[in-house]
Every structure is written in structure tokens, then in C-alpha cells.
């Protein structure tokens, strides 16, 4: 039964790859013009050591594609910054300091795992970035290492992958071609699953390679008919099959809790599971023209520097114009060299050619969004409104470029990474706040695009302060803006770490303590003022007695001394006053 399933997987994959052949031809042409080292879609045989750019006359199309490909990592995944942050998709819940600290802990754990040198995340995403820019899509996988000590990221050649979408437009069924040596197959699969030819190769030629198909699909699609329908992989949503395509033998059937492949797609078209690159799709004619124009300019330059010549064949038997060379001429009579040899003047207008090339390169730069990558220049004389307008325009221009990359590319990579790390028990659940229990984890991003949006938020906060201050100076009622909330939004917007922020309870306790201290100080000030008034009154009465304006007080008798005891002193409890 397993061999029958193996043949079914091979036949299904063959159909998918046959339908994909025209796309491979297009990708080959695109790669020849913009990504020569990747121009292996229709090649067969050993291409190692080949000069991939021997057909090019102008390197500019390759350079602009390379610049855009490199900008993905530097813009969306800067290594020196925390470019992503876990979120629960609930702003009120995320604002809680305890929740924010745990989400920051999750983000740091993922970042540590991704940038582990053994995970090869940077290498895989660098390959994927250039495929994504050039061909509009790429294929990566997020796997556990065999010892389950770290993750392992891989990028796969688009030529070797074919996939299908489900009914909601997600890729959940993929066929991948691979070549494994007999030695690797023996180490990776059971001895009983290997074909006899593989076993013989292990003894005689361990380096002999065999064609292997890696097929991953939902479990409910795998063998959905027959007596064993939906029995394999029922405990897991997906199943991975390894098939010996040369011998039609099933090597392994491995249930999987998730779909390990990530297939980011830049611009999709209705009814197609494959995407296109909006950059190379419009730049391909200009790329071809750039090569033709470069050849034309080189020929014109050669003619201008080393123009063609004309000579009398009867005079010159053998013509040699090399430096220091001698040419024998049979001159008869009074004939001169200038009479039998002359240079054909070529008046090439190179300025026109250079202007045409500059215009072509400008179009290529626009096709690859090079003119929109840098932040707008802000002058010292610009007003806040002008700065804000430029930043908003910059964000609008970059959205078509980077928005699909964040959602289709980075977010899906983070989802797979989070799922794998959770399966490896890399997250501490004992410190998770109860309010985050059962919450879905999503991702927010920090990059120049988000930085531009953050600058807009901070600018709005500053403008609000200016408006409220001006209104207060003019005596216009109560302040409309809640500056506390606005300040908190601005602080979160500029990316202040969660561990810097104080909890609401701490801030409330400090506020109460400050209010109590202020009340005590006020009560003490009032008591001091009362004592001062009493002292002034006593001094005034004494002065009036000395001046004869008031009679001197009579001396009390013994009985008065016994009966007229001094009043008990009055004590002021400042805490009661403050309360």
C-alpha cells in the first residue's frame, strides 16, 4: 500500500511540475537579466564554476535588483534593532506593564533562537529575499534540528518546488524535489524502507545520488479514499512524505503538528497559486534594452577612439597598425601615404547615447523602488506641518513595497518560529500573566516604515501640547487633551522597553503619596500662619500696654490660681488634617 501511495505522490507532483514549466522559462529569462547566478531554472548538468554573467554587457540591472534585495533585511529586519514585538492584538491588554514585560520576554526568546548561528536564519532569509524581489515569491522551511537543540532555517530553489492553495488562499500543499546520496538516505530512513539499489549503492558508491520527493499536505487530504482513508497522520494536522522517485518507494510518512514551509508571495493574481514580482515584471524590457544599449555605446566609443581606415590594396600588401609595428608600402611616383591611406571620420554624438542611458537607468531605478527607499530630507527651516506632510507621503509611497513583505513574509516566519519553539518548551508559562492565558499571539514590527509613522505620532503629541498651551494662555476653559494618555502613547510609540515602564499600581501609589505629602505641607503652612498671627497679636497688645493704651493685667489671687488653671495645649494632628 505504501508503494502505491508513493506512486500517487510522484504522479501528482509530476503534474504540478509539468504545469509549472512555462513559469520556469519566464523565471530563467528574468534571472538571466537581473539575477544571473540564479539562472538555473532550465539548465541541466553541472553548472558549478560557470561564468554566470558572460552574456551581459551592462551590470546596472543586476545592481538595482541587488540593492532592493539587500534593503529588505536592512529595512524590515535590521540586525542591530528589535524589529518585531509580540502582541495580543488588544491594545488595552498590551498596555498593562506585566503583560508588556511577558510579551517582551517572548520576543526576546524568539530573537535569540532565530539569530543562533546554528539556525542559519540570516543565510536562509538572504537567499529568500533575493528570490522574493526577483521572482515575486520564495520558499523557506522552519525545522527543528535532529537533536532538538535549535531551529534550522532553509531556503529552497523555486525550480524544485510546486504547491497548491487551499480554499482560503493559503499554501498548505507542497512538493519539493531533492537529491540525496545513498549515504544520507541510509542515515535518514529505516533500512527496510530503502530500495535494493540504494542498499547496493551504500556498499559500492555511497556518494551516488537519487531523486527524492518531499511532499507535505494536510492529513485529511492524504489518502482520502480507500480502506485506510484518513488514518495516516490523523493525530496531527499535516503529514510529511519522503518518496524515492527513482524507485517508486515510500521512505517515510511523518505526522507534523504544523506546515513547516513558508511561501511568501509579493503580488498574487486571481486564480493562480504563483505570484509575480511587480519590479522585474515591468523592468524586464528595460533590462534587455540596457544590454543592447551598452553594446551600442561600446561600439560607438570604439569607433570614436579607434576609427576605421581605408587603404590602397596595391600599395599595402600587409597592413599593421599596432604600436611600434612597421608596414611596407609600395609607393610609386610622387604619391604620398595620405593619398593611399586615410582614416574614415566618425562623428559619434556620445552625449545623446549617454542621455539615453541615463534615462533608461532612471526607469530601472523606479521599477525597483530605489527612488523611494530613503527617508525624505528635512531642512532646518521646515515647519512641523511640512515635516509631517513629507513623512506621511513617504509612508504612502512605501506601503505597496513593504506591506506585503511584513504580512506575507516576516509575520509568517515568526508564526512558524513561535510554534516550533513552543513545541520545544522554550517559553516559561509559570510567569505568564493570567490575562494573557489563551490569547492569540501576533506581531508588531519596528522598521523605518513604522519609524516614520511613529514620528508622525510624536509630532502630533507636540502639536497637541502647543495647542493646549496656547489655549491656556488665552484663558480658554479646561484642557481638552488628556496629556497623561497622550504621553503614554508617545512613549510606547518610540519603542521604550517595557521594563522601563512602571506599573499602574506603582504610579497610583506614588500619586497618593505625593498628594498626602502635599496635604501635610499645606496643613503645616496653615498652622505656621496661625501661630504667626497670634504672635503678632501678642506683640501688639504688649506695645499698647506699654504705651498706656491698655491697662496692665491684674494679678490673680491664690483662689484664682487654684481655680484658673491654664488650658490644656491644643495639638494639631497633621495626618488628620491631610486626610
Where would I find each of the regions flagged by the language model?
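A general secondary-structure signal for short beta-strands and their flanking turns/coil
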Residues: 135, 209, 436-438
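Long, contiguous amphipathic alpha-helices that act as assembly "spine/axial" helices in icosahedral shell
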Residues: 95-144, 274-309, 345-378, 387-421
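Extended, helix-rich architectural segments
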Residues: 1-205, 579
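C-terminal anchoring/interaction modules
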Residues: 1-26, 34-35, 39, 308-579
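Flexible, active-site-adjacent loop/turn segments at secondary-structure boundaries
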Residues: 119, 133, 137, 149-159, ...
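Structured, contiguous alpha/beta core segments that scaffold functional sites
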Residues: 14-17, 143-324
